[in-house]
Design a protein with these regions (language model features):
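Phosphate/nucleotide-binding beta-alpha loop and adjacent structural elements of enzyme active sites
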Residues: 1-235
Length: 235
């Protein structure tokens, strides 16, 4: 089986930036962390998840309990699920068109919060890989992190094909921004599906009569512009 480890020198360490770093699922870089090949700088404003991250990863890695965005005050829309809260309001009428979607994104409360721009954080260092999952605010994170993006080699971001949150950026918006900033679409790592109500096939689960709602998309540095990268990055 092909392995990234074969491409990395023994002393190579990948600098990872994770925005929305909760432990809801296994991180795509987890094996690199387990073998000492990656250092993570993560942002997770949920207090319980933030403490879990610090406990799980230890002092080698850095985590901050911050909302990352455009640097302005914003409203955080708390929901009944700690992993579906967002800086954008849930689009409940749309969510109610599908099985098992609105029930996971039920509004609970609103909180005024401060957001931080990635480019305003001085000690992030030279980042190689970015992973983003912030429920509709992905483009806000990237737009306000263009200094950081200059050295990034790959990005894994959640993208949406339906407006689950009012005013959120769609897949086409993220794609246009990333291509304009020197990245090319590489692949999709799985889709989120939901069947329309009231249609349901118990034998097929959520993939019956389905709609593709979201996905994790991977972008890589434009291979036609590799001359713009430093020798260290190319190695």
């Amino acid at each position: 089986m092909w392995s990234l480890f074969r491409l990395l020198d023994d002393g190579c360490r990948v600098e990872v930036l994770d925005v929305g770093a909760s432990l809801a699922s296994t991180a795509p870089y987890q094996k690199l962390v387990e073998t000492g090949r990656a250092r993570v700088t993560g942002f997770e404003p949920n207090e319980a998840e933030y403490e879990r991250l610090r406990s799980s990863y230890g002092l080698t890695h850095r985590f901050y309990p911050l909302f990352v965005g455009d640097g302005k005050e914003a409203t955080f829309h708390e929901t009944n699920n700690p992993f579906t809260g967002s800086l954008y309001a849930p689009n409940t009428p749309l969510l109610e068109k599908f099985h098992a979607l609105a029930s996971l994104v039920t509004p609970v409360a609103e909180h005024r919060v401060a957001t931080t721009c990635l480019d305003d954080i001085a000690d992030l260092g030279d980042i190689d890989f970015i992973k983003i999952d912030v429920q509709g605010a992905e483009l806000d994170v990237l737009r306000n992190g263009q200094r950081i993006l200059q050295g990034v080699l790959a990005i894994q971001t959640e993208v949406n094909f339906l407006e689950q949150y009012h005013g959120q950026a769609m897949f086409s918006d993220l794609d246009a921004f990333l291509r304009a900033n020197g990245f090319q679409f590489h692949c999709v790592l799985g889709y989120g599906w939901r069947p329309f109500l009231p249609l349901l096939n118990p034998r097929a689960g959520v993939k019956a009569f389905n709609q593709q709602v979201w996905a994790d998309a991977v972008y890589v540095r434009d291979w036609m512009q590799l001359d713009r990268l430093s020798a260290e990055k190319l190695e």
